[in-house]
């Protein structure tokens, strides 16, 4: 913190204010806060003499003389009118003295002259409307003056609120923060009787904080405030801000306060929220209160260095608005409820329809959410595609390739996001009817609604689903429109619960019934599905079983084109990852799940905010709401308790601790097991630190060498996913092969004579990309091509024109220097049916062995083509399962220990020292990962030799056999046999846990459903690994007879 005596940068206003007395009130009325509450629950502000106090500008009279001289010399304004124009500008517009102190006489003269010119220009207009517009923008402050009608949103002209918002409030430079003051002139412009327009003045100033690096939890105004705010704000105003900031620092959504002003028709609305979490909300708030026939006399935006923004708006009924509007108190009540909805999506895709009054805020945000839904789930393949599948031979590679290409083509053409937007925008009445149906189910009306009931949307008859279907058919004009609008009905019928109507939300989340998904595209039915929409992103969470585990990944896009591709593939990629996880989780109690968050094109640096909103909004649907007014109960059509188990994935490893602590702060009883991969101080077992995923991958690599009696040191190896990644770095550190190529996010590193191992290990330990490789350690045939490189000549004379394109396709090159390929990173489907032929030469695979460490790197049909060409392929669902085993055993420990035991035995102390039990438990987890990997490797190798079936098929067959038997066993009578149950659990649970806690205590603490899952998965996996995926009908009897014999001996 800055010390009181520390020198601070010069600040023109603050320096002038230091010792100025006396000060007089601002020309705008301001008010003092008293701890008095009236009948509507608002605090009451009584005095009109305090609030913001403008400093007296002692040099004002002298400045006016200088301004007059400049204007007269300019000659643009008739000399007889100069005094009147100056007096009007200085005294009638309500401009604060701060402006006159900050500006030099020349700038003031220019502004007065410009305003006069606007009046002259208006005189020549046919409608004689005076439209005065003025702007002055500098790097540290700005001024905007515009003509506006109270209570009306203008769609023409410069739209200064949007401009100052995008340039100053939501600007890209996060080191600069700006405060805003805006006033409306008391009188109207023009001489005409029906003139309604007034001048609106905006003043923007760069903040100069007392302590610019304040802690996010700091709330003392004397530490976190801007110096100009401290100089201008009175004691009572500071108290209002102090109170709301103290609440805001512990809240993730907006905090809203309303103050009545005694003896006035005005009310003061104060909104506090975390800075830069709601881009566009300043101008959107104006649209919101205009919708309810309300206007503002003054607005302030104050920034604080702890990361909080506070907006203070003085509201009154807009007297000039025609039409019926509710009383101010009721309008304000509705506005405060809708601010949390606006905060979630300040600028939705249909916002202009709200600003123009065509649709309500709820209707436009609902339409935006369904617009997102439609992009992912409009059934674009149709019945013709289903017929084609039936007609073609799935075993014929050329047929499969045709289907694959047709599926991609059908999904990319016709229904673009813009086309869907255009269709929805052309049917506002249908949107209104469909929203009414949605709200009739999910809007819970309580006493809070009864007291201030006004219709937030025009009254609409709620139609049944059948009547909605008829209305859609009747209103639309073609098949495409019917498909899009019918998707609204699909969405409404799929929503089981949502936080759409709960206060203080930060994003919109929907728990959907996934039964609407077409079986032909998604053959394995999902158990659960969440859709989350934030102002920065969209995302899904999918799971295949009630108790399921999987990571949360954030997808970034390097360009708009990359975003469009990522958006198109988002759900399919999520489904594929969750499906892989389901197969990968065969050895553990949990089924497969996955969460994917896609950042919007202009929000690529907002991954933390997107993740936090995603987690918090999902928690809204998992936790029981017990704080009325903050988290109200929701309509729950699902009707059962749900728990999600999550973990780290791409771009989320550093966010896991926050998610764990946030779940604890929100009162989740399962906070210890909510996320795995958390830091050791919270009892986590970091996969990267202990190489958990790599240990499993290495068992498959070593297994191939063992079976074929190969010398690893003579194996030439290629790897995607470099030394900067979790899996890539540990693969380098544990390997003993000769690396010939590494591809990572920065580019390609290749050396046919072998890449220097010591230099690679140095990068792996530092988690550095290959861009940091010392190229002096390459041989004469080696090279490095970075993504940003162009026109690079390789040692063999080949010219690389584009480094990024070279990086993206390097793994497909036939250069004859790769024996073993281990993908440890890279985008899904990097090798598919259309590209796999580049790895096949004269019917033979150019790479003999592939162990797929990265999820979904190779499509299933491409794997089969490679195996057909003689390649030994072990797929991701088999090889990459070490992390899930570690995560599962981490959760088991958190469920088995009580809170005190968990902290003692699983959490590192403040100095980073690991408890003795923790160290031993990690070793047991590592051994378990290697044992499970060896068991599956041997089972697949053995069954391949017996049946000749491709290993990629056998991997899936084993997974399916285990998961199917697992489900049967959990429901079987075997679970009811106490001897068998205890015997299996004793074998399945880690010995260390049993010795430390005791089997009986573990059984008592761990939920019954979780114990059943442990029982089923252990028995099923051990049986299938021993007897194969297609055992005889007597095999299980033999297996259990042997186990019963052992039990009886005990």
Swiss-Prot record:
Keywords: NAD, Oxidoreductase
Catalysed reaction, written as an equation: L-glutamate + NAD(+) + H2O = 2-oxoglutarate + NH4(+) + NADH + H(+)
UniProt KW Oxidoreductase keyword: yes
UniProt xrefs under Pfam families: ELFV_dehydrog, GDH2_N, GDH_2nd
Keyword Cytoplasm tagged: no
Biased composition (Basic and acidic residues): 12-22
GO MF terms, alphabetically ordered: glutamate dehydrogenase (NAD+) activity
Residues the record marks as active site: 594
GO terms, biological process: glutamate catabolic process
InterPro entries registered for this protein in UniProt: Aminoacid_DH-like_N_sf, Glu/Leu/Phe/Val/Trp_DH_C, Glu/Leu/Phe/Val_DH_AS, NAD(P)-bd_dom_sf, NAD-GDH_2nd, NAD-GDH_euk, NAD-GDH_N
Residue ranges of the region described as Disordered: 1-39
Enzyme Commission no: 1.4.1.2
Annotated GO CC locations: mitochondrion
Subunit structure: Homotetramer.
Similarity comment: family membership: Belongs to the Glu/Leu/Phe/Val dehydrogenases family.
Name of protein: NAD-specific glutamate dehydrogenase
Species classification: Eukaryota, Fungi, Dikarya, Ascomycota, Pezizomycotina
Gene: gdh-1
């Amino acid at each position: 913190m800055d010390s009181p005596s520390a020198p601070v940068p010069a600040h023109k206003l603050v320096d002038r204010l230091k010792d100025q007395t006396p000060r007089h009130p601002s020309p705008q009325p301001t008010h003092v806060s008293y701890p008095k509450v009236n009948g509507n629950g608002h605090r009451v502000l009584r005095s009109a003499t305090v609030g913001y106090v403008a400093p007296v500008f002692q040099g004002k009279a002298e400045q006016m003389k200088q301004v007059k001289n400049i204007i007269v010399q300019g000659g643009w304004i008739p000399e007889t009118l100069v005094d009147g124009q100056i007096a009007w500008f200085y005294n009638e517009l309500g401009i604060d003295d701060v402006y006159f102190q900050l500006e030099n006489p020349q700038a003031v003269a220019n502004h007065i002259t410009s305003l006069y010119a606007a009046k002259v220009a208006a005189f020549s207009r046919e409608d004689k409307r005076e439209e005065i517009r003025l702007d002055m923008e500098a790097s540290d402050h700005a001024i905007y003056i515009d003509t506006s009608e109270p209570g009306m949103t203008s769609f023409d002209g410069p739209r200064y609120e949007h401009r100052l918002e995008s340039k100053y409030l939501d600007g890209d430079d996060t080191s600069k923060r700006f405060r805003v003051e805006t006033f409306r002139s008391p009188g109207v412009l023009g001489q005409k009787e029906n003139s309604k327009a007034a001048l609106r003045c905006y003043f923007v100033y760069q903040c100069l904080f007392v302590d610019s690096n304040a802690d996010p939890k700091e709330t003392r105004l004397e530490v976190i405030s801007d110096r100009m705010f401290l100089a201008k704000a009175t004691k009572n105003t500071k108290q209002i801000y102090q109170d709301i900031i103290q609440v805001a620092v512990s809240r993730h959504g907006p905090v809203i306060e309303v103050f009545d002003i005694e003896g006035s028709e005005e009310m003061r609305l104060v909104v506090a929220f975390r800075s830069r979490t709601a881009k566009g909300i300043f101008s959107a708030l104006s649209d919101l209160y205009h919708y309810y026939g309300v206007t503002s006399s003054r607005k302030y935006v104050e920034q604080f260095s702890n990361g909080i923004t506070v907006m203070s708006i003085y509201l009154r009924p807009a007297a000039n608005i025609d039409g019926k509007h509710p009383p101010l108190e009721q309008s304000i009540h509705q506005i405060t409820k809708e601010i949390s909805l606006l905060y979630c999506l300040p600028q939705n895709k249909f916002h202009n329809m709200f600003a123009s009054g065509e649709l309500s805020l709820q209707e436009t945000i609902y339409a935006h959410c369904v617009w997102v839904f439609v992009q992912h789930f409009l059934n674009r393949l149709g019945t013709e595609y289903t017929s084609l599948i039936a007609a073609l031979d799935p075993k014929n590679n050329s047929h499969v390739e045709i289907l694959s290409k047709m599926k991609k083509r059908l999904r990319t053409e016709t229904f673009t996001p813009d086309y869907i937007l255009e269709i929805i925008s052309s049917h506002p009445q249908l949107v209104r009817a469909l929203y009414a149906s949605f709200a009739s189910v999910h809007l819970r009306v309580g006493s809070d609604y009864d007291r201030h009931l006004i219709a937030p949307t025009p009254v609409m008859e709620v139609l049944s689903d059948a009547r909605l279907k008829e209305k859609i058919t009747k209103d639309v004009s073609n098949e495409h429109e019917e498909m899009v609008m019918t998707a609204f009905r699909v969405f409404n019928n799929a929503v089981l619960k949502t936080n759409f109507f709960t206060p203080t939300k930060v994003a919109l989340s929907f728990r959907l019934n996934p039964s609407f998904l077409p079986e032909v595209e998604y053959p394995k039915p999902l158990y659960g599905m969440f859709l989350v929409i934030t102002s920065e992103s969209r995302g899904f969470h999918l799971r295949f079983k009630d108790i399921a585990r999987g990571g949360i990944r954030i997808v970034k896009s390097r360009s708009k084109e990359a975003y469009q591709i990522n958006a198109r593939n988002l759900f399919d990629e999520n489904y594929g990852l969750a499906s892989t996880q389901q197969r990968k989780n065969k050895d553990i109690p949990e089924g497969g799940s996955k969460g994917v968050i896609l950042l919007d094109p202009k929000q690529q640096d907002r991954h933390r905010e997107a993740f936090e909103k995603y987690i918090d909004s999902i928690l809204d649907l998992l936790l029981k709401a017990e704080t009325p007014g903050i988290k109200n109960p929701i309509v729950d059509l699902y009707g059962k308790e749900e728990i999600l188990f999550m973990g780290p994935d791409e771009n989320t490893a550093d966010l896991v601790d926050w998610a764990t602590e946030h779940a604890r702060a929100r009162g989740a009883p399962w906070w210890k097991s909510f996320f795995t991969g958390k830091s050791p101080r919270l009892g986590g077992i970091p996969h990267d630190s202990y190489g958990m995923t790599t240990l499993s991958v290495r068992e498959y690599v070593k297994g191939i060498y063992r079976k074929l009696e190969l010398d690893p040191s003579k194996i030439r190896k290629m790897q995607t996913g470099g030394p900067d990644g979790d899996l890539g770095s540990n693969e380098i550190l544990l390997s003993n092969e000769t690396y010939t190529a590494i591809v990572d996010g920065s580019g390609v590193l290749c050396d046919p004579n072998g890449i220097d191992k010591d230099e690679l290990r140095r990068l792996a330990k530092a988690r550095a990309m290959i861009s940091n490789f010392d190229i002096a350690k390459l041989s004469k045939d080696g090279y490095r091509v970075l993504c940003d490189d162009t026109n690079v000549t390789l040692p063999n004379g080949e010219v690389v024109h584009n480094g990024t394109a070279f990086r993206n396709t390097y793994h497909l090159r036939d250069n004859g220097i790769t024996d073993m390929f281990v993908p440890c990173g890279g985008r899904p489907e990097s090798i598919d049916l259309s590209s796999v032929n580049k790895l096949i030469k004269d019917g033979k695979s150019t790479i003999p062995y592939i162990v797929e460490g990265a999820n979904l790197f190779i499509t299933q049909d491409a794997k089969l083509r490679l195996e057909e060409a003689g390649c030994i392929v072990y797929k991701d669902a088999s090889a990459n399962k070490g992390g899930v085993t570690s995560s599962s055993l981490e959760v088991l420990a958190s469920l088995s220990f009580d809170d005190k035991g968990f902290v003692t035995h699983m959490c590192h102390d403040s100095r980073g020292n690991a408890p003795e039990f923790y160290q031993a438990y990690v070793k047991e987890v590592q051994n378990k990962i290697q044992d499970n990997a060896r068991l599956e490797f041997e089972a697949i190798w053995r069954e391949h030799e017996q049946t000749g079936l491709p290993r990629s098929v056998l991997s899936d067959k084993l997974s399916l056999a285990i998961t199917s038997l697992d489900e049967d066993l959990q429901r079987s009578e075997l679970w009811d046999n106490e001897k068998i149950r205890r015997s299996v659990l004793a074998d399945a649970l880690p010995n260390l846990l049993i010795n430390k806690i005791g089997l009986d205590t573990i059984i008592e603490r761990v939920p019954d459903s979780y114990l059943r899952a442990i029982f089923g998965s252990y028995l099923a996996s051990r049986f299938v690994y021993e007897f194969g995926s297609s055992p005889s009908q007597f095999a299980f009897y033999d297996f259990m007879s042997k186990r019963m014999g052992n039990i009886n001996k005990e």
